[in-house]
């Protein structure tokens, strides 16, 4: 699994800044011949005296270069979302300009041109913004009931939901720690924060979640959580060492027992559980949580025991093979 890397905005500046003014794009405009982008006012002023791209010297148009430039709304939205405070400052500058120059004709312009668009309307989220969210326990049975088109909600379902107001820069990891401390969940259990049915990564911020899942601000950001036992990974290195040590011991004594089929049977390691030994639940204080690991139950059935004991085992010692029926 590839590890996600986070980059600084300074590494993206060459793709977000205008080479004519040295600032971030405002009203980003792209030349259709070479796809280089600039601020609208910068490129319009430049093309009054030149008909070539200021970066690659491609001819924009022989006589009317303004015909081959297009407004790039997608690029401008990316710049506004990546640069903190840029959209708010630009809207303030436009409002101040039209307030100082009432004679300026802005009647034909949009609300954004006049600086009358708020961050909420543009869906721009800043790091210091407070986001309202709701979080509730992820219940698979509840999803099945919704699939059966049952619209009535019981009081228990309504009370399960909690509402929080958090900074947009707060990460999923902080939210998991908050849930663990509030609910006194032991470290033997894993907490997953989810959006609908998809688990969220620890480094996601609330702002990332709002952008990724296109939160429309028509209600609190809906999040869910689930609690499950922590999967314990087996240490393969220690098992290999144990197998190699047992193999060395068998090879030392194998020369005396090479002719005997019974003597060639490998000994079972004492650290591995017997298939006939019942395994108790590791979490008696949470009986409702299953102790199933890796898709297999902790208590094997009788059929599995009989097939395990009746299976023929074959081992090779010093080039000779021995088979036993168990």
UniProtKB/Swiss-Prot annotation:
Keywords: Chromatin regulator, Cytoplasm, Metal-binding, Nucleus, Repressor, Transcription, Transcription regulation, Zinc, Zinc-finger
Residue ranges covered by zinc fingers (RING-type): 18-57
Region (Disordered): 236-326
Any single GO BP term: negative regulation of transcription by RNA polymerase II
SMART domains documented for this protein: RING
Region of interest called Interaction with PHC2, as start-end residue ranges on this chain: 162-182
Subunit structure: Component of a PRC1-like complex.
Full protein name: Polycomb complex protein BMI-1
Organism of derivation: Gallus gallus
Lineage: Eukaryota, Metazoa, Chordata, Craniata, Vertebrata
């Amino acid at each position: 699994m590839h590890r996600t890397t986070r980059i600084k905005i300074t590494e993206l500046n060459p793709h977000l800044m205008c080479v004519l003014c040295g600032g971030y794009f405002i009203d980003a405009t792209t030349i259709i011949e070479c796809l280089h982008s600039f601020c609208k006012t910068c490129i319009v002023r430049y093309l009054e005296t030149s008909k070539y791209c200021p970066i690659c010297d491609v001819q924009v148009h022989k006589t009317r270069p303004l015909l081959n430039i297009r407004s790039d709304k997608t690029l401008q939205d990316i710049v506004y979302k990546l640069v903190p405070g840029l959209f708010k400052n630009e809207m303030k500058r436009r409002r101040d300009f039209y307030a100082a120059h009432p004679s300026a004709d802005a009647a034909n312009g949009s609300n954004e041109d006049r600086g009358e668009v708020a961050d909420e309307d543009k869906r721009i989220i800043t790091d210091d913004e407070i986001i309202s969210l709701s979080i509730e326990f992820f219940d698979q049975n509840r999803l099945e009931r919704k699939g059966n088109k049952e619209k009535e909600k019981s009081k228990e379902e309504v009370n399960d939901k909690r509402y929080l107001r958090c900074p947009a820069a707060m990460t999923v990891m902080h939210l998991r720690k908050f849930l663990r401390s509030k609910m006194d969940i032991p470290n033997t259990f894993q907490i997953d924060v989810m959006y609908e049915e998809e688990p969220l990564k620890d480094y996601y911020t609330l702002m990332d979640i709002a952008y990724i899942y296109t939160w429309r601000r028509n209600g609190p950001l809906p999040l869910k959580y689930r609690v499950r036992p922590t999967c314990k990974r087996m240490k393969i290195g220690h098992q290999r060492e144990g197998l190699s040590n047992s193999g060395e011991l068998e090879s030392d004594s194998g020369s005396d027992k090479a002719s005997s089929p019974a003597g060639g049977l490998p000994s079972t390691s004492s650290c591995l559980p017997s298939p006939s030994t019942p395994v108790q639940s590791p979490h008696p204080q949470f009986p409702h949580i299953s102790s199933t690991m890796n898709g297999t139950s902790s208590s094997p059935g009788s059929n599995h025991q009989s097939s395990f004991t009746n299976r023929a085992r074959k081992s090779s010692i010093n080039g000779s093979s021995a088979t036993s029926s168990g």
